[in-house]
Amino acid sequence: MLLIAKYVIPVTSPYIEDGAVLVRDDKILDLGPASQLKDKYPEEEIRDFGLSVLMPGFVDVHTHLGYTALRGMFGDLPYAEWKRQVLHTEPFFTEEDWLDSARIGALEAVASGITTIADISASGVSRIPASEMGLRARVYYEVLTAQKEHAADAVRAGVEKIEQWKDECGSDLLDFGLAPGPVYGCHPSVFQAIADVAIERGIPVAMHLAGSQEEADFIRYGSSPFGVHVSEHEQGKLASAYPPWLPAGTSPVSYVSNWGILDVPGILAIHCVQVDDRDIGILREKDVHIGYCPRINAKLGMGSAPLEKFWTAGLTIGLGTDSPAAVDTTDMIDEMRIGLMITRATSSERFVRASAKNALRMATIGSARALGIEDKVGSLEPGKQADIIAIDLHNSHQNPTTDPESAVIYTANQDNVKMTMVAGRILYDDFVHVSGCDRDAIVDRARALRVRIREEVSDEALRRSLIEHASEDKQDRYNR
């Protein structure tokens, strides 16, 4: 099939006006000016997308699709309180609820032009809708324990779980890895145990790192905004007032580096907001890959990752949408635009590398490199997998444009994605899902889930409030 559009953006080479991409089976065979490829391949079926951009699909290096149903429930909260509210809600979810939530997230990812996701959870639920809908995915199993004596068993169980998922999935589009739980909720021996097994077996590893001031203070001083009284469900996921080990007196990056996990080849460190120049030096020395998630960092007041410094240090950087429970959408175009603008507003070298071209690279080939799959995806090149999207520019305020990369970043959004192809298979075409999934049923189930969860969370919040007030009244009577 010959895909034709006004602009073809290979990402790793200059864009082609009036360009074409030849796809056969699951691979890209050729690309170039449309007139030349039509003459060269006269028997090929032609799909002409007109005033559109053809480009590699977005590679989302960090998401939590299982939380999609929670979006809009906890708005305008700082990170620590948002985290607590989300964790309070988790017990209300059944296994089927998590699946319904992940399905609506995967459905929207496809419609947003995302062709590869990297998802972290303890359930691995995202692997199911990814497989159902034809997405490329890496699913990390989250290993979480605050108890040193449980660390080895927890990591061993994680390895067994991802081996089980591999056996069950039966798809070349899915692979699996390990992810330690939050630095503030995980015993450090977990980091060492994961590093040992990952290096030995070549298992991909990702971790949240230096994402908030709360995390930085907890590691350095042992302080925590979450308080002493945490529920059984929250144990391990939230830090109590004092860690079960001595405060490290150093930064999160230095702390985890001392426990060996940054020695895992190609480890993906997500966020890296609370970092200084020494930390960046460690990240560079260890060749740590960065997962940049500007929207959630800004919305939850976590800070802003020093993107320009990462670029200057030569770090590999990919882009992630993170939790839909915070950012509401899986819009990688919005993620690029906001990240670019935040960097220009906060960096002393505003326009050295913070360009539309580099933002587009970060969301495609940069993200592919961050996951170690740049040999397969991330750019339009002969021999690579045919993970391709078409973005409609008819409504672009830059139309007619002399810079299609700028038009995508500054005037498009996820609603302008008109076609999504993964491994040569079209999943979304002319703004309609064609992968065989029942879109209406998925949406209806997600809506019903949101209504039920909202009601149950509201009832639980009222119950907790009554208990807290009763406790305060009892204390007042005692004081009198």
Tell me what each language-model feature is.
Residues 1-19, 24-29, 40, 209, ...:
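Active-site microenvironment of metallo-dependent hydrolases
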Residues 64, 122-123, 142-146, 179-183, ...:
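Active-site beta-loop-alpha junctions enriched in small/polar residues
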Residues 57-68, 204-213:
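Histidine-centered catalytic micro-motifs
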Residues 69-100, 138-144, 213-264, 338-354:
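Active-site gating loops and adjacent loop-to-helix segments of metal-dependent hydrolytic enzymes
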Residues 53, 71-135, 156-170, 447-451, ...:
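Alpha-helical scaffold segments that flank or form the walls of functional sites
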Residues 36-55:
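Active-site metal-binding motif and surrounding structural segment of the metallo-beta-lactamase
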Residues 228, 258-262, 308-395, 411-412:
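His/Asp/Glu-enriched, well-ordered alpha-helical/loop segment
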Residues 128-129, 155-289, 301-317, 375:
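Histidine/acidic residue-rich metal-binding segments in metalloenzymes
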